[in-house]
Amino acid sequence: MAVDPIHPKWHARFLQLTEVIAGWSKDPSRGVGAIIVSPDKQIVATGFNGLPRGFEDTDDRLQRPNKYDFVVHAELNALIQCARNGVSPIGCSIYSSFSPCVNCAISIVQAGIRSVVTYEIEESDERWLESIEKSVRVFRESGVEYKRIPKNTVGVTA
């Protein structure tokens, strides 16, 4: 599926915002931020990885391995925010400060997102390569554009 070209400065701006939103996460090892952007470049939802609403933030729930059972991923939180606010994500793009896992990739596809923009994988993230490769396969086979931006170029473009 071809996507209308967006000037690289917009990718950089939106990825910078995902970093700010990632800072809202209480996850001690990896904060992740996501934003959903309409085709006319309007931010329609944000999300960060965190515990469910009303669920008490305790250290043991945010540590491995417990966090894998309790933490809602940033991308899913952004999609849920769309649902809660009555905003359709169909045809939108999602920007994430970390490449979506395969479960989030499936949710992104099912929600009708047309493109995913994230950072290039860094060496420190290589343990996630298998999951990310599955995500890329889901996007490719489902016709969702997947774009990786080198992290060192974000912030260079104003």
Per-range role (PLM):
Residues 1-158:
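Zinc-dependent deaminase catalytic domain
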